[in-house]
Curated annotation (Swiss-Prot):
Its EC number is 3.1.26.4. Pfam families: RNase_H. CDD domains: RNase_HI_prokaryote_like. Belongs to the RNase H family. The gene is rnhA. InterPro entries: RNase_H, RNaseH-like_sf, RNaseH_domain, RNaseH_sf, RNaseHI. It comes from the Bacteria. This is Ribonuclease H.
Amino acid sequence: MKSIEVHTDGSCLGNPGPGGWAALLRYNGREKELAGGEAVSTNNRMELMAAIMALETLTEPCEIVLHTDSQYVRQGITEWMPGWVRRNWKTAGGDPVKNRELWERLHAATQRHRIDWRWVKGHNGDPDNERVDVLARNQATAQRDGRATS
């Protein structure tokens, strides 16, 4: 099983507002950058999209260390998801889970991989986190300025 290192980030100019996501995948000394955006989104949706797109890009089962500065994503997938599924996609308070379609997509994308979800403090000098932050912000800016390519 291949070992892959993944770094993800999402960005939103306003919340909601133009959004961008980015991922950096590293395997065996090679790197691949992924990035995209949406004209209107939220920061949480973009954080989820970064992880989803990174995992959906992989064509075979892998051992992954996925770094995210989003506690929402890390806690959602590692702690909250089992309860949401048990309660038919309701929170502990009985409200519908926000971004359910993205959580379901992320859950599906995780099934064939072994993933170690690691939280990294954002904007704290981690070079890979800073790199995906710039890529995601550039995508959000491109969405805002009408020059998006994705």
